[in-house]
Design a protein with these regions (language model features):
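Charge-rich amphipathic alpha-helical interaction elements
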Residues: 1-141
Length: 141
């Protein structure tokens, strides 16, 4: 007799869902890391590139402040994207946790059914051995 799990296809789907949720989380974390790197780079750029010389013309002054303003707007935009991605990451972690929970539940069910199957087979084997022993005992007398 061979054990076959009656919900094998469901378990397979649960494992697939877990793998997909894990991939989605990985992509979101990569995006978040990229934005964090962009923020760090932009902050460094702002610190080094915008050291204003003492004497500048009005045009150079205006360009300097316009560039500084655009860099700060970009920094604000990146921080906003970072917050949004942080929320998406937390949401995705919740989905992954749920997928893992469902998969583990199916694996536990499979384990229980397999244990019950093994016990049933062992019980049937024991009954057969007992029957054989009884027949041998009765045939001797």
């Amino acid at each position: 007799m061979k054990f076959s799990f009656r919900f094998a296809s469901v378990l397979k789907v649960r494992r697939y869902q877990k793998r997909k949720e894990k991939q989605k989380l990985g992509m979101l974390l990569n995006q978040k890391r990229m934005i964090e790197q962009q923020i760090r780079d932009l902050k460094k750029k702002c610190q080094h590139a915008f050291e204003q010389p003492q004497k500048q013309s009005a045009l150079a002054n205006r360009q300097y402040y316009a560039q500084k303003h655009s860099q700060h707007e970009r920094l604000t935009q990146l921080k906003k994207q970072h917050r949004v991605l942080g929320n998406k990451v937390e949401e995705q972690r919740g989905k992954l946790t749920e997928a893992v929970k469902k998969m583990r539940m199916m694996e536990k069910l499979k384990k229980r059914e397999k244990r019950a199957f093994v016990e049933r087979v062992e019980h049937m084997d024991q009954l057969q051995q007992n029957e054989i022993a009884i027949q041998r005992y009765n045939s001797d007398y």
